[in-house]
Amino acid sequence: MAGNSIGQLFRVTTCGESHGVGLMAIVDGVPPGLELCEEDLQKDLDRRKPGTSKFATQRKEPDQVKIISGVFEGKTTGTSIGLYIENTDQKSKDYGNIAQTFRPGHADYTYTQKYGFRDYRGGGRSSARETAMRVAAGAIAKKYLAEKFGLVVRGHVIQIGNEVAEKLDWNEVSQNPFFCGDVDAVPRFEALVTSLREQGTSCGAKLEILAEQVPVGWGEPVFDRLDADIAHAMMSINAVKGVEIGDGFAVAGQFGHETRDELSTQGFLANHAGGILGGISSGQTIRVAIALKPTASITTSGKTINLDREDTDVLTKGRHDPCVGVRATPIAEAMLAIVLMDHFLRHRAQNADVVMPFEPIAP
């Protein structure tokens, strides 16, 4: 299983399963001298961790991260940073009924066919439990980028099911369990998710993630364009089925004179491209949106097959999110930060001596 790392110079490698002993990450490429402690990572982990509201899974994990290497006397040493989170609230008995069957819409069938064997407890490696380490690693990137450039990565929920947020107040995002910036949409989100849980079903979601104060010039055409790597990172998140950069799929119905992001000496006149032109950051705000599918872990019985290749029915047990998008915001923020940190280091490595012909225009 070779797909456990992301990034080239800022490289994050994770391991661990939903019901294993714990989760681990190795973070390579962190420059030396960054002041770093566990609390710096814990803030984002607390935003992601399960069991914090009635609208998410009731599995209760403290997700207390431990830094086991790469930091000395409160500063990064430039060597690999090792991170560890213990699993404490596994209930593997809830999954005994799927040891011989495949949950429809899950990775059970494909993991079994690929590896010939699978850890069925909570989905094993395919569970979103592994994203805790992404958030921890992403918090390191966010801290460095903020201190170096004033760069801010933040996200919010746009849509849950058929309910859509109509406005954005960043002060509201941290005040509700949905990471929603529309105070009027929160009661509608609450009612919908409560109803879904009662019905034994689930719904999808759409999130927006922004990166502000990104310097111009990051991205490595042609195959490692910044937007290509962002899309790759976002699609690696569990349940993500669509990624948009800038205006995204809406451009199919737009016209060239509307979307070409004209320039002036005073700055850009629009940002339909989402802060990336030709695969390189323009200095404008990077705008990313992701769509997450409804989780297939629902309490309604579904048709499937078993290991004997026989038709059967399966009922999913365990503790699950009625909408996985509720806790996905800090995960998506982390993935965007990881990509940006990697591209900063790559840009510096190749282009540190490049002299721009003029100062960048305003975003």
Curated annotation (Swiss-Prot):
<feature type="binding site">
    <location>
        <begin position="125"/>
        <end position="127"/>
    </location>
    <ligand>
        <name>FMN</name>
    </ligand>
</feature>
<dbReference type="GO" id="GO:0004107">
    <property type="term" value="F:chorismate synthase activity"/>
</dbReference>
<feature type="binding site">
    <location>
        <begin position="293"/>
        <end position="297"/>
    </location>
    <ligand>
        <name>FMN</name>
    </ligand>
</feature>
<dbReference type="GO" id="GO:0010181">
    <property type="term" value="F:FMN binding"/>
</dbReference>
<keyword id="KW-0521">NADP</keyword>
<feature type="binding site">
    <location>
        <position position="278"/>
    </location>
    <ligand>
        <name>FMN</name>
    </ligand>
</feature>
<feature type="binding site">
    <location>
        <position position="48"/>
    </location>
    <ligand>
        <name>NADP(+)</name>
    </ligand>
</feature>
<dbReference type="Pfam" id="PF01264">
    <property type="entry name" value="Chorismate_synt"/>
</dbReference>
<dbReference type="GO" id="GO:0009073">
    <property type="term" value="P:aromatic amino acid family biosynthetic process"/>
</dbReference>
<comment type="subunit">
    <text>Homotetramer.</text>
</comment>
<feature type="binding site">
    <location>
        <position position="319"/>
    </location>
    <ligand>
        <name>FMN</name>
    </ligand>
</feature>
<keyword id="KW-0456">Lyase</keyword>
<keyword id="KW-0288">FMN</keyword>
<keyword id="KW-0057">Aromatic amino acid biosynthesis</keyword>
<keyword id="KW-0274">FAD</keyword>
<dbReference type="InterPro" id="IPR020541">
    <property type="entry name" value="Chorismate_synthase_CS"/>
</dbReference>
<dbReference type="InterPro" id="IPR035904">
    <property type="entry name" value="Chorismate_synth_AroC_sf"/>
</dbReference>
<dbReference type="GO" id="GO:0009423">
    <property type="term" value="P:chorismate biosynthetic process"/>
</dbReference>
<keyword id="KW-0285">Flavoprotein</keyword>
<feature type="binding site">
    <location>
        <begin position="238"/>
        <end position="239"/>
    </location>
    <ligand>
        <name>FMN</name>
    </ligand>
</feature>
<dbReference type="GO" id="GO:0005829">
    <property type="term" value="C:cytosol"/>
</dbReference>
<comment type="pathway">
    <text>Metabolic intermediate biosynthesis; chorismate biosynthesis; chorismate from D-erythrose 4-phosphate and phosphoenolpyruvate: step 7/7.</text>
</comment>
<dbReference type="InterPro" id="IPR000453">
    <property type="entry name" value="Chorismate_synth"/>
</dbReference>
<keyword id="KW-0028">Amino-acid biosynthesis</keyword>
<comment type="function">
    <text>This reaction introduces a second double bond into the aromatic ring system.</text>
</comment>
<protein>
    <recommendedName>
        <fullName>Chorismate synthase</fullName>
        <ecNumber>4.2.3.5</ecNumber>
    </recommendedName>
</protein>
<comment type="similarity">
    <text>Belongs to the chorismate synthase family.</text>
</comment>
<dbReference type="GO" id="GO:0008652">
    <property type="term" value="P:amino acid biosynthetic process"/>
</dbReference>
